[in-house]
């Protein structure tokens, strides 16, 4: 994923101001700072990124995890997601980086569509990885670019070679296309939900339940 972040910086420009969630995944801030781009912190509230703070932050790019925020676990509701998209629409140079890591294993509540899936104006860069869903040894991350940024990527960064072998890419593609990945996610989600319920039940039955 670190390489994906660096490609995004090169694509969007080091003259842009990147905003990250506060609190948030500290590694992201360090990557931006190490690549000599201005990085500002946007506080979160009970629904995710605070819109008033975002508007006052003078950021060009917002990097967030709306479906499974780290470290709070907050899931941004659909109304706030549309507000965030509205912020991006107010300026041509604004974009949103939707980091959807670990969103597949949300165990409570109804599914909420990703920002990218409800974006009709090409303002969202979607990124994810298979490290959590399949195995830490599968070092494959990806990003989905809006049409206009895809064209810019081809013009500016098409000289980069993929660090993942063709064999791994084709194998993973076949695994997805044949429906095995979706079945795997569904089975794993059920397993994790059972494990969570057993853990909570054990805590409730513990003599220490009143203080945990």
Residue ranges and their predicted role:
Residues 28-31, 202:
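A generic "structured core" feature
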Residues 38-45:
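Short beta-strand->loop structural element characteristic of the AMP-binding/adenylate-forming
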């Amino acid at each position: 994923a670190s390489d994906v972040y660096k490609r995004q910086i090169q694509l969007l420009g080091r003259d842009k101001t990147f905003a990250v969630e506060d609190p948030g995944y500290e590694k992201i801030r360090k990557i931006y700072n190490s690549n000599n781009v201005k990085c500002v912190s946007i506080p979160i509230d009970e629904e995710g990124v605070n819109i008033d703070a975002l508007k006052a932050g003078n950021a060009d790019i917002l990097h967030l995890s709306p479906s499974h925020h780290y470290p709070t676990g907050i899931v941004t509701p659909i109304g706030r997601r549309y507000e965030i998209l509205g912020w991006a629409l107010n300026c041509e140079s604004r974009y949103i980086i939707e980091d959807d890591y670990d969103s597949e294993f949300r165990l409570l509540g109804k599914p909420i569509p990703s920002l990218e899936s409800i974006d009709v104006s090409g303002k969202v860069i979607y990124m994810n990885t298979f490290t959590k869903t399949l195995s830490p040894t599968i070092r494959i991350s990806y990003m989905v670019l809006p049409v206009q940024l895809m064209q810019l990527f081809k013009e500016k960064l098409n000289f980069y070679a993929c660090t993942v072998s063709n064999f791994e890419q084709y194998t993973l593609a076949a695994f997805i296309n044949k429906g095995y990945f979706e079945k795997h996610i569904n089975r794993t989600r059920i397993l994790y939900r059972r494990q969570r319920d057993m853990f909570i039940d054990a805590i409730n039955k513990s003599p220490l339940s009143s203080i945990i």
